[in-house]
């Protein structure tokens, strides 16, 4: 009786048809979440308890590296995004930002991320390098107009995200803090009982000189990673690079004309003339006609 009163679970006997992966199925059947609309979910009491415990773990690690928690607005004026030249990219075409106009016709967007707002605030409050470094973080609801919401909470239109923003006087000051933040993330995942792989990643629309993602390997997901057997290198498939192929020296000691009839590609030439691709230079000439 007490369990029912404290945690009204609302479990399901059958698996909902829209649940494609096991995590989504278990969250729905276990009464952790309830679907409100496509990509929109209600967090039920037992799920909220889980979120609060995870938040406590996150806060402890970030407070240990002197980050300050705050709460930023979810409704952003378009001017801030236009100033950073990201408004069009986030709202036009397949942009992921929900946007609207108020009664006065002013444009706003529902936050998919908070770089613009926190940068605006920091520019007003930081007057000297002596105030640096500074790091702010929040655990806040985000909105993204996903083209195809799927996999439950994995790709939804409304979700909770922890994001942190730090400000530094130089790159030399940033580097050691980046390492501290990386270690904090490792501790967070460890304390949550997750085995992760740190991989190089594409910064995407957010940008940045470097980006690292912590991946949990699973059968279900939307990302793929490539890694070496030794574990010395791992990267998101969008960012992964390979070592250049070993060059094979050209044996011929003198220049020689070679006929290449019906050999339309480098592969054809290599196969018909016992050559390696590293021994060939391809010259392409473009003819441009300019009308004035």
Please report, for each region that a protein language model flagged, where it lies by residue.
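TRNA-recognition modules of translation machinery and tRNA-sensing kinases, especially anticodon-binding
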Residues: 1-290
């Amino acid at each position: 009786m007490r369990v029912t009163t404290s945690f009204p679970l609302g479990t399901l006997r059958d698996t909902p048809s829209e649940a494609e992966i096991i995590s989504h199925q278990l969250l729905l059947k276990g009464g952790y979440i309830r679907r409100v609309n496509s990509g929109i979910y209600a967090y039920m009491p037992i799920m909220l308890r889980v979120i609060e415990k995870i938040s406590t773990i996150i806060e402890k690690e970030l407070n240990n590296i002197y980050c300050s928690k705050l709460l930023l607005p979810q409704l952003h004026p378009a001017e801030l995004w236009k100033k950073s030249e990201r408004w069009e990219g986030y709202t036009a075409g397949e942009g992921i930002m929900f946007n609207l106009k108020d009664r006065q016709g002013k444009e706003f967007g529902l936050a998919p991320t908070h770089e613009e707002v926190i940068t605006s605030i920091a520019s007003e409050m930081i007057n000297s390098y002596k105030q640096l470094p500074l790091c702010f973080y929040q655990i806040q609801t985000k909105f993204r107009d996903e083209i195809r919401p799927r996999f439950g909470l994995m790709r939804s239109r409304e979700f909770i995200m922890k994001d942190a923003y730090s400000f530094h006087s130089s790159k030399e000051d940033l580097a050691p803090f980046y390492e501290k933040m990386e270690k904090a993330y490792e501790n967070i995942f460890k304390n949550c009982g997750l085995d992760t792989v740190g991989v190089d990643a594409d910064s995407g629309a957010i940008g940045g000189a470097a980006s690292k993602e912590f991946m949990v390997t699973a059968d279900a997901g939307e990302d793929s990673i490539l890694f070496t057997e030794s574990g010395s290198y791992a990267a998101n498939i969008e960012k992964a690079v390979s070592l250049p192929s070993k060059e094979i020296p050209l044996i011929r000691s003198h220049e020689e004309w070679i006929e290449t009839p019906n050999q339309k590609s480098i592969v054809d030439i290599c196969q018909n003339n016992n050559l390696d691709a590293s021994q060939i230079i391809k010259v392409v000439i473009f003819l441009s006609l300019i009308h004035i």
